[in-house]
Amino acid sequence: MQVYRFREKRSGDRPCVVTIGNFDGMHLGHQALTGAVVNEAKDRDLSSALVTFHPHPQEILHPRRPVQRICTPQLQNRLFDDSGIDEVHVIPFTPELAELDADAFASRYLLQRFKLEKLIIGYDFRFGKNRTGDFILLERLGQENGFSLEEVAPFRIKSQIVSSSLIRQLIREMRFSEVEEYLGRPYSLLGTVQKGEQRG
């Protein structure tokens, strides 16, 4: 897996299947989304790419209410790698970026960056100033720029939609068995799995 800061030039010009979002925690819903991207790319002999943000947008938009990260950036990158994604592109989220309208955002961070064949997004993905960018806008951009668009349905466990905000709430309430069910892996406060003394 190749990791790029957005100021770094992407090596090569291989056509891509792309997804974009925060992916905090890489829970089962995120894994379903990245799995769809990886499978589509493999089926079409394309590169799979994931676009994400650092810091978390909420840290810039609402600095007095800092977001509780579910896992460390180091663990997040390891989970991206485990997912089979070929490329991760990290956008520095700044106050200036937060002011970009949706069309300008899509042009700068998707259309100019990638030879985009297909974009796969989560059901709740929004982008651009005031979150005005949505599926309808992306569908129009796809028709104008020759890429296809797919929206992945929410991932549910027992009718409950798995989301990062839900997992943060469960962590605050110390309901760790449910946290691990929604993450699909063990959870620790440090963001890494801690081994015991293994005395039997």
Where are these regions (language model features)?
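Short acidic-hydrophobic, aromatic-tinged amphipathic segments that line or gate anion-handling sites
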Residues: Q2-E8, H89
